[in-house]
């Protein structure tokens, strides 16, 4: 996993004025969201390392791309070097994870942003990404460092309650629930994930919940279970361009299947924000990235993140290219032009990166205020 717009069925007797009014309302919402985001901090405030000025990476003379057949690994450029995570909140969350036997993708996937996310960072939005259903995946994607097995241990029936209890005590603003793939289970673990969402919301309805979920092998009943669980953001990563998908992802993961999952999630629950992520540096071309972004927009995806692929161990795919911050900025601008609610694009950006969660929180809070105002006007 880590990392198709079907038309809604309508009846001909529905008056055109209803559709027109709905379209107008959606346009107003979109404009208001854009305005709100414009007033907030720029995305570069989150991803730019203050110790690395523009001139430093512009003048970098190291090699950024491996040639075909070349075996030697590329040297890590300066803009990808991060500090060791520290801080009270970081230590608190890590300790409680151990106590409750919970896994986080932040640790399992060796995310470079763990200290900033768990600690709250400059903008104070504390986030964490919990990995449900254990630390062992039934798939073997060539970019991912999570353990794999054909038949992982059984699910922990106490995990939904333990997870919700921990999250409620942390005082987080935004939580991301992700999971390993569990192809060994009839429902892929979808009911387990949905139960966890409901437990979290029962304890604190103000926490925004994002679920970064598997494709469930295209099983739409599983997609519907998650979409209607009470979550706020439905995320499923396309990971790479179509041409590289068979080479990068597990053979059971398919590019078009991912697009269908994202499309159907929105159909099952039109109020959801949908989100996906693309890794760069695996040998893709600009034309292929452009095509992937357009496919995601056609699938109705609201938010997209683009980040640098980093080889987790010597056993995984080597980095073909280190993409410059300037190029990531280009894709951020291109994503905005294509109509995504936000495009998070930077070398250290990951699908669960806290800056993206800050922006999505703004969107969700805005929606909640509009909904409350509408309810008050009816009274």
Curated annotation (Swiss-Prot):
Show the Pfam families listed in the entry. Answer: LIAS_N, Radical_SAM
Cell compartment(s), UniProt: Mitochondrion
The record's listing under PROSITE patterns reads: RADICAL_SAM
Requisite cofactors:
[4Fe-4S] cluster
Where on this chain does [4Fe-4S] cluster 1 bind? Answer: 106, 111, 117, 352
Q: Where does the Radical SAM core domain lie?
A: 122-341
**Catalytic activity reported:** [[Fe-S] cluster scaffold protein carrying a second [4Fe-4S](2+) cluster] + N(6)-octanoyl-L-lysyl-[protein] + 2 oxidized [2Fe-2S]-[ferredoxin] + 2 S-adenosyl-L-methionine + 4 H(+) = [[Fe-S] cluster scaffold protein] + N(6)-[(R)-dihydrolipoyl]-L-lysyl-[protein] + 4 Fe(3+) + 2 hydrogen sulfide + 2 5'-deoxyadenosine + 2 L-methionine + 2 reduced [2Fe-2S]-[ferredoxin]
Primary location recorded for the protein, binned into one broad class: mitochondrion
Write down the EC number: 2.8.1.8
SMART domains documented for this protein: Elp3
Q: Tell me which UniProt keywords the record has, alphabetically.
A: 4Fe-4S, Iron, Iron-sulfur, Metal-binding, Mitochondrion, S-adenosyl-L-methionine, Transferase
The family database entries (InterPro entries) matched by this protein are listed as: Aldolase_TIM (IPR013785), Elp3/MiaA/NifB-like_rSAM (IPR006638), LIAS_N (IPR031691), Lipoyl_synth (IPR003698), rSAM (IPR007197)
Gene Ontology annotations for the cellular component aspect, listed alphabetically? mitochondrion
| This protein's name | Lipoyl synthase 2, mitochondrial
Please tell me the species this chain comes from.
Drosophila yakuba
């Amino acid at each position: 996993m880590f990392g198709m717009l079907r038309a809604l069925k309508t009846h001909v007797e529905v008056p055109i004025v209803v559709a027109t009014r709905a379209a107008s309302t959606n346009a107003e919402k979109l404009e208001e969201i854009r305005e709100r985001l414009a007033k907030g901090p720029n995305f570069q405030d989150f991803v730019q390392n203050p110790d690395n000025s523009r001139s430093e990476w512009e003048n970098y003379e190291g090699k950024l791309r491996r040639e075909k057949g070349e075996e030697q690994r590329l040297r890590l450029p300066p803009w990808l070097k991060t500090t060791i995570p520290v801080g009270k909140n970081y230590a608190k969350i890590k300790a409680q994870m151990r106590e409750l036997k919970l896994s986080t993708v932040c640790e399992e996937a060796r995310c470079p942003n763990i200290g900033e996310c768990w600690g709250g960072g400059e903008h104070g939005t504390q986030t964490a990404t919990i990995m449900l259903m254990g630390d062992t995946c039934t798939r073997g994607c060539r970019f991912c460092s999570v353990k794999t097995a054909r038949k992982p241990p059984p699910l922990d029936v106490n995990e939904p309650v333990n997870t919700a209890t921990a999250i409620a005590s942390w005082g987080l603003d935004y939580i991301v629930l992700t999971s390993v793939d569990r192809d060994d289970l009839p429902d892929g673990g979808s009911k387990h994930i949905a139960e966890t969402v409901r437990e979290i919301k029962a304890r604190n309805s103000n926490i925004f919940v994002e679920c970064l979920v598997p494709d469930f092998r295209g099983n739409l009943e599983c997609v519907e279970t998650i979409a209607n669980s009470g979550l706020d953001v439905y995320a499923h990563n396309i990971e790479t361009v179509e041409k590289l998908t068979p080479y990068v992802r597990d053979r059971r993961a398919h590019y078009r299947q991912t697009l269908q999952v994202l499309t159907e999630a929105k159909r099952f629950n039109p109020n959801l924000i949908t989100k996906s992520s693309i890794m760069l540096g695996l040998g893709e071309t600009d034309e292929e990235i452009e095509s992937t972004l357009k496919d995601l927009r056609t699938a109705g995806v609201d938010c997209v993140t683009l980040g640098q692929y980093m080889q987790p161990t010597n056993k995984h795919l080597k980095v073909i290219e280190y993409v410059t911050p300037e190029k990531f900025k280009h894709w951020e601008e291109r994503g905005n032009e294509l109509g995504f609610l936000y495009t998070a694009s930077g070398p250290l950006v990951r699908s669960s990166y806290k800056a993206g969660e800050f922006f999505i929180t703004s969107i969700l809070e805005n929606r909640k205020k509009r909904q409350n105002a509408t309810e008050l006007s009816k009274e």
